[in-house]
A protein has these predicted regions:
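Proline-centered loop/turn at the N-terminus of a beta-strand
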Residues: 106, 171, 241-243, 259, ...
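Catalytic beta-strand/loop cores that center a nucleophilic Ser/Cys/Thr
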Residues: 281-323
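Active-site glycine-centered loops adjacent to acidic/histidine catalytic or metal-binding residues
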Residues: 112, 246, 289, 331
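Active-site-proximal beta-strand elements of phosphoester/diester hydrolases
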Residues: 171-176, 285-286, 326-330
Length: 357
């Protein structure tokens, strides 16, 4: 089926549709990963976004039962140069096309993804829409310009009810802003007794659970849209150790008086170098975020910058001067990507153990 991708800036890309035969609109972003498309599709942080894969051939190893990061995809669409029709991997169960049909998702292949990525890199992320080949381009552009996307992405992907993932070790309350299953896997491997709660849970409700530590998960959207979470974090600081990842990192920054801003085209992929300022060591990290903590705004707060991105020198890590609280902008659980930084989960375990003494 013939499809085309139309950007609000007027550019049009013609290609072949795959998956469900439907039109879909979202914020168009790019991801530089060569692999990990299954985790990407099921990552709640991509809620409302159409993702362009910069690597030219996607779908090579199909879809398996193990690599999902959530039960239902939140992604709006996928853009690839070429989609693999005959995947080859011993774990393959279905093809990428079959997954998109099953989950009622729309994608487009056969377009110049290098040109699209250059547009996004130079102009910044834009709104876009995958439409049928006969759709009127001028009308679609005007629709995109006048469209305001929802700002309740966290509410869309957060759990609605609390649930437990039992373990024999330290009790961790995981606040779900759109958490990947990889975070739960890393905590479970360290025998943590995990309770997953909704993003709108209050500090008082969390403290009644008597946790040893709080994990603030990744999630989609603008961190400033989560004012209730800031009150929750302020109510927990100093009372229990806190570890924030991605959106959780940004929320800690806001809760402590810093500011955030929207990046031009974000960091998305499994090959982003980050410098640990305390250890003077570089880790290759998995990242997926369109916002960052403003480094200038850290002045006058109780936060210390601990990590920076080597590509653009933006903030990638924070630590509280007084309270047991730290966070990183990238994904130490990887899923997908390098596991250089999963030692941070061990640091969190140590922080909780020391706090109990």
């Amino acid at each position: 089926m013939k499809k085309k991708l139309i950007l609000e800036s007027g550019e049009v890309f013609h290609g072949e549709g795959f998956g469900a035969d439907l039109e879909t609109a979202g914020e168009v972003v790019f991801n530089t990963g060569m692999t990990g498309y299954q985790e990407l599709i099921s990552d709640p942080s991509y809620c409302g976004q159409i993702v362009c894969m910069t690597y030219p051939l996607i779908g090579n190893y199909g879809i398996n039962r193990d690599d999902y990061e959530s039960i239902e995809p939140a992604i709006k669409g996928l853009i690839v140069k070429e989609i693999c029709d005959l995947p080859s991997n011993f774990r393959t169960q279905i093809t990428l096309q079959e997954l998109f049909k099953k989950k009622n998702l729309s994608g487009i292949s056969g377009i110049d993804t290098r040109r699209l990525t250059r547009i996004l890199r130079n102009s910044g992320v834009v709104k876009g829409k995958i439409v049928n080949a006969d759709a009127d381009e001028n009308t679609t552009v005007e629709e995109l310009k006048s469209t305001t996307f929802p700002t309740d992405q966290v509410d869309q992907v957060s759990t609605k009810t609390s649930y437990a993932n039992p373990g024999r070790g330290l009790k961790v309350v995981l606040v779900d802003f759109g958490s990947k299953l990889g975070i739960i896997r890393e905590l479970s491997q360290r025998n943590c007794d995990i309770i997953v709660v909704s993003h709108d849970t209050t500090a008082e409700e969390i403290l009644l659970m008597d946790p040893d530590g709080i994990m603030l998960s990744n999630g989609p959207g603008d961190p400033e849209d989560n004012q209730q979470a800031l009150e929750m974090i302020r109510g927990l600081l100093g009372k229990v150790p806190i570890f924030g990842i991605c959106l959780g990192h940004q929320l800690i920054g806001l809760a402590c008086g810093a500011k955030t801003f929207k990046l031009k085209f974000g960091h998305r992929g499994g090959n982003h170098p980050v410098l640990d300022l305390e250890k003077n060591k570089v880790a290759i990290t998995s990242q997926n975020h369109g916002y960052a903590v403003d480094q200038e705004s850290l002045k006058g707060t109780d936060l210390i910058e601990t990590h920076i991105a080597l590509n653009d020198r933006t903030n990638e890590g924070l630590k509280h001067k007084i309270h047991p609280c730290f966070s990183v902008q990238y994904h130490p659980e990887a899923s997908p990507g390098p596991e250089d930084a999963n030692y941070l989960f061990d640091d969190f375990i140590t922080l909780m153990e020391d706090f109990k003494k």
